[in-house]
Amino acid sequence: MRFLIRATIPTEAGNMMVQDPNFLRKLEEYINKVNAEAAYFFEANGNRIASFIVDVQSADQIPVLAEPLFIKMGAHVELHPVMSLDDLKKGMPQAIVEANSYRTDAAAEQFGSM
């Protein structure tokens, strides 16, 4: 299953990392080790964010993915399952059937048929 790893890096730790001349090499090693499909870096709420798209086959892979970010970056780490458009197209018909099975008459009147 495809997951988004979002690592929020505290300012102090981030400042130290970017001053390390080996930082980019270490980051690239992590990306290669976890076989990230994609890696993106951005700012959010004043923090440095690193995000990676990875394939997780089983839950026991999570520590391998997260611990280097906790230990080496002091990051706040979140893991979120994500879908491609093809995944969404595949799952949506059954999701609509399931959602409609829980729908009440009041909800149908308020929201109409979708």
Question: Can you name each region flagged by the protein language model?
Answer:
Residues M1-M114:
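Conserved, structured core segments of small domains
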